[in-house]
Regions:
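Broad structural signal for hydrophobic residues in well-ordered alpha-helices, predominantly aliphatic
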Residues: 6-7, 47
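Acidic/histidine-rich catalytic cores of soluble enzymes
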Residues: 10-13, 24
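Conserved small/polar residues in nucleotide/adenosyl-binding loops
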Residues: 1-5
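C-terminal beta-sandwich/jelly-roll accessory domains of carbohydrate-active enzymes
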Residues: 125-197
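Residue-level recognition of the N-termini of beta-strands and the immediately preceding loop/turn
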Residues: 13-15, 155
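Short helix-capping segments at alpha-helix termini
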Residues: 7-11, 147-149
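Aromatic/acidic polysaccharide-binding cleft in carbohydrate-active enzymes
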Residues: 17-135
Length: 197
């Protein structure tokens, strides 16, 4: 039950969460990070049951209030950096888009749904909440049906972390060019994709 349903005048009405982000300032370095992606994954895991939609502020780093950024990564609000480079949080939303069907598992660090066709989709996140930068390993075991040997299945894993799907790291490794070359932008776009195992 949603809180809104306890108020007769609001019961059953749509709730839309609009223009939210992890910080209210347009140049917060956290916006460009994997930590932001994990934080948003956790936040989305708590929003979906009673809300019709949610709208992250904003899709791209280039918008009228501040103009074109001076560097590709500057802590802008967007899911996509200047140069059409997807940030890690972009993938959080791409992964969540697949979570249709029935929620069968929700915890502090994961969400799994079962689709109508019998397949499963899940999102697992692992933020560094202690602020010390220490790695915390998250391990999941997938239990297959007893007769899985006679069935076809595929376990596809897409990873975004500090080493994969993280164009900010590559930009740092390139020396943080304010105006990256065409080849550097292409490289950052390529490494912005999740690692698939």
């Amino acid at each position: 039950m949603c809180i809104r349903d306890s108020y007769e005048e609001f019961a059953g009405k749509d709730i839309h969460i609009t223009e939210y982000n992890t910080s209210y300032i347009p140049n917060a370095p956290v916006h460009d990070t994997c930590y932001n992606a994990a934080y948003v994954a956790h936040m989305l895991s708590r929003l979906g049951d009673c809300h019709t939609s949610y709208s992250y502020w904003t899709f791209g780093d280039v918008f009228e209030e501040l103009g074109v950024p001076f560097t590709p990564f500057h802590g802008g609000f967007g899911l996509v950096a200047n140069g059409c480079i997807p940030k890690p949080t972009f993938w959080t939303f791409a992964f969540y888009k697949k979570l249709t069907g029935t929620c069968i598992h929700r915890s502090e660090d994961s969400l799994i749904t079962k689709q109508k066709d019998g397949s499963y989709y899940g999102v697992i996140w692992n933020p560094d909440n202690d602020g010390k930068g220490e790695k915390k390993e998250v391990t999941y075991t997938i239990h297959l049906p007893e007769n899985y040997e006679r069935q076809e299945y595929c376990n596809l894993v897409k990873i975004v972390d500090e080493e994969h799907g993280n164009p900010l790291k590559v930009w740092h490794d390139l020396g943080e060019p304010a105006n990256p070359s065409k080849d550097e932008v292409s490289l950052m776009r390529e490494v912005a994709k999740p690692w698939i195992t």
